[in-house]
Amino acid sequence: MNTCTPNIKSSYTYEDLLASGRGELFGKEGPQLPAPTMLMMDRINLMTENGGLFDKGYIEAELDIHPDLPFFSCHFIGDPVMPGCLGLDAMWQLVGFFLGWIGGKGKGRALGVGEVKFTGQILPNAKKVTYRIHMKRVINRKLVMGMADGEVEVDGRVIYTATDLKVGLFQDTSAF
């Protein structure tokens, strides 16, 4: 069984997030964030073990938007827009990060999402994306799994919402 002990830090810099991608933040047994260019945040402003809509934990993170971000040059030529799936992946990344933050061990894998709604887009002239994750449940048994609702906001406007984001931590992913 995993024993989850919360990390005492409540915010993380870009350098901290890169350390997570190298397996240095939560140790070699803990979950890792992806490295750039798949890392979809520049900082985590707030992590709480309680709080959020369900009082099970809350995460707020940001991504600074620049016209030279790699996806703008290919999605789509002449009509650049950040792929919506990257915003969804960012929310999964944050749920997995939360599981590592509370002391969970294993390799993080997205397990699903209940519903996703897109009501806007992220264009190269945007300034900042804010992600908000409201943890709903954490299971800490042989498998550590987190479930959350989340939203993506661009320049103060909510443009994506997701319910029942699920991420699990696995000791062995060979049979996954």
UniProtKB/Swiss-Prot annotation:
Its main location: cytoplasm. The active site is at residue 75. Gene3D superfamilies: Hotdog Thioesterase. Keywords: Cytoplasm, Fatty acid biosynthesis, Fatty acid metabolism, Isomerase, Lipid biosynthesis, Lipid metabolism, Lyase. Its EC number is 4.2.1.59, 5.3.3.14. NCBIfam families: fabA, PRK05174.1. Homodimer. Belongs to the thioester dehydratase family. FabA subfamily. This is 3-hydroxydecanoyl-[acyl-carrier-protein] dehydratase. It comes from Actinobacillus pleuropneumoniae serotype 5b (strain L20). The lineage of its organism: Bacteria, Pseudomonadati, Pseudomonadota, Gammaproteobacteria, Pasteurellales. The gene is fabA.
